[in-house]
Amino acid sequence: MPSSAHLQDPPPHLSRTLTQDEEQTSLRQSSSCGPSTTSASASESLSGSTKSRISQKKLLEGMLPKIIPTESAAKLLCCYAVFMALTVVVIALSIALSVKKTPQISAVNTYAACQRNWIGFGNKCYYFNETARNWTFSQTLCKEQEAELARFDNEEELNFLKRYKGSSGYWIGLHRESSADPWKWTDNTAYNNLVPIKGEEKHGFLSDNGLSSGKDYIKRKSICSKLNSYTSQCP
């Protein structure tokens, strides 16, 4: 039995040798594992840095879509403000120009309708009395209707009376004191001699030949006239 136990236990020097070999082997394994651990740590560090950069990139990419629309909105608001300002300026200029042009536009007079049996022309109403009377009585009839024997102030009114009267002669409001005196209207304002009056008598009438003078007592038809009320309107 002692010999068998002795055979199983290695010699002391061999045991130490094995132990040293195991330690060296362990050290080699440890040294061989060391770089792997360091490499893993470096890889983990590199991976963390890459992830950090990727996260920052994503953060920037996430912010850019928000920043760009904000800048675009600001630009749009600025453009809108400029557009509105220009619109206001254009409207103001248009109004100013229209106001300046307004005095150049001739106003058209819109006259109220003349009363029944009266005819409107220009700013007057005319009544053609078909009953023959002398000049004085004809003037009285006109006054009863708040009018006077007819007066014309321009060639247009005279031509209207000549066209409308037909072929008959009509008393009008011209008269004078004598053949040497100037002609006047019934309100005693001077006649402007727009058309010469033929004859030497003191009372005027409208004939086919234009304006003529006749005796007061001759009976003729007559024309009354009076100013018409009106309101001025733009065309």
Curated annotation (Swiss-Prot):
Topology Extracellular: residue spans: 97-235
* Domain C-type lectin intervals: 121-232
Top-rank lineage group of the source organism:
Eukaryota
Q: Where in the cell is it found?
A: Cell membrane
Cytoplasmic topology ranges: 1-75
Point to the regions of Low complexity compositional bias: 30-50
The record ties this protein, via PROSITE patterns, to: C_TYPE_LECTIN_2 (PS50041)
Glycosylation is annotated at 134
Q: Which UniProt keywords apply?
A: Cell membrane, Glycoprotein, Lectin, Membrane, Receptor, Signal-anchor, Transmembrane, Transmembrane helix
Instruction: For the region Disordered, give the residue spans.
Output: 1-50
* Alphabetized CDD domains for the sequence: CLECT_NK_receptors_like
| Protein name per the record | C-type lectin domain family 2 member D-related protein
Q: Which organism is it from?
A: Rattus norvegicus (Rat)
